[in-house]
Amino acid sequence: MIRIENISKQLSHRILFIEASAALNRGEKIGLVGPNGAGKTSLFRMIIGHELPDEGQVSVDKGVSIGYFSQDVGEMSGRSAVAEVMDGAGPVSEVAAELRELEAAMVDPDRMDEMDAIIERYGEVQARYEELDGYALDGRAREVLAGLSFSEAMMDGDVGALSGGWKMRVALARILLMRPDVMLLDEPSNHLDLESLIWLEQFLKGYEGALLMTSHDREFMNRIVNKIIEIDAGQLNSYSGDYVFYEGQRALNEKHQQSQFERQQAMLAKEIKFIERFKARASHASQVQSRVKKLEKIDRVEPPKRRQVVAFEFQPAPRSGEDVVAVKNVSKRYGDKVIYDGFDFMVRRRERWCIMGINGAGKSTLLKLVAGDSKPDEGTVSIGASVKMGYFAQHAMDVLDGEMTIFEMLETTFPRAGQAPLRALAGCFGFSGDDIDKRVRVLSGGEKARLVMAIMLFDPPNLLVLDEPTNHLDLDTKEMLIKALSQFEGTMLFVSHDRHFLAALSNRVLEITPEGVFQYGGGYTEYVERTGHEAPGLRS
């Protein structure tokens, strides 16, 4: 369906692809992976013709329809979310638009002399609309939006009043309703709550077309794809299997290549040693010459070019008291909406609570109450003895000094740390080389989030309160964070929609539902086993 043949591509001074090739065949569901900046979005744009390769070609079979979802959703306003979604439904939306025009023409007194032709055309268009299942389009659009957690009021309200994250969902719904032959989805899991994520996962698993997608959510990708295309050192490497298979195969390939490299280096060293030893002796001249020629003809094995992710290690945090957080008889409301009413909750040392709940259940509110960013209407929230808190929330990016560079920000925050540890810290969170000289104001939201996280974790607290800490982190950086936090000896209270993160780090679950608040003594994996669902909104 789509062939990428020997493409080379350079952006400014950065080489993205060097004679790279890959293919997307009918029915394949492919995960596109690679570090930030490797060229994933550029590859999508070349497939849809918005960019061209410098060399080589990208070809799409004739008649193949493509739906492309990107993070740049453009302007939306002046109509409902349902209308916006239906408008992107491919041919059926165009047929629907013509039907509406013909219906208006049929009641237009100025066009009475054209009526026979209008009625004849209306019959043709109506038949085509029925053939495309157009009368079910509104229902299908609402079904998709409901899957992405839209309420009826949000579906019918002005799309322009929605936040950026909800507009992203509208843009995604347009592509899903379109059901093209090929879907290109660039980070579809961004901005989704866990319930929406699981619904999208089921939708894509049942989708009969071909799929090429990127995602920073390991579990989401692993459950959908049957092939991985990896961008590595300008090449496109294909692996048949899911993401877990790819991880294992990649590690084996690297190990094999490293072994080959080391064996060849040992052989080369032996040959060079012989040449150096006997090159001055006439009696060994022919042997030396023979070995020199042999070395010249050998194809050199390169060491693995894998980008190494630096491990982050916590400095020892001061020990807190046994009772870390005590929430007693707390009530909290926003306007008429009651979030908590007589709520009690205790967090003890070394517990790792993940907070579960649908949108608006009060997850972030609880973290704000614990962090002191919000006050209860009634009751008390007490922090225990010797507790040193680190609080990560999305608004934390707003307090960064835009005129400072990344390194200046780290130096100002930790004036006694020294350059080497701070550079190592920056590297752990994806800022290497010249990146540390970027001014904060030019950083993306994801880069700012990583900088805030780095500052918070360098001088470690003994209580971490984390609101969606994995947003914007790529797969490698997220894995580094999981490994680091698994070694953290303090207490954690966190919200995340990343199931891999939840399963790896939690040992307690607090589930907030309309029926009440439920506590589970095991981690997320045990919660799923006990309840039979992966998210509170999926309760039967």
Give the location of each predicted region.
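ABC ATP-binding cassette signature C-motif
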Residues: M1-F261, Q308, Q315-S540
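ABC ATPase nucleotide-binding domains
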Residues: Q257-K279, H284-K293, Q308-V309, E529-S540
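Short amphipathic coiled-coil heptad-repeat segments
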Residues: R142-L148, K273-R277, K293-V301
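Short intracellular "coupling" helices and adjacent cytoplasmic loop segments at the cytosolic face
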Residues: D108-P109, F274-S286, R300-P303, G430
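Extended non-transmembrane interhelical loops and adjacent amphipathic helices
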Residues: I119, L192, Q289-D299
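Short, flexible active-site-proximal loops enriched in glycine and acidic residues
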Residues: A153, A266, P304-R306
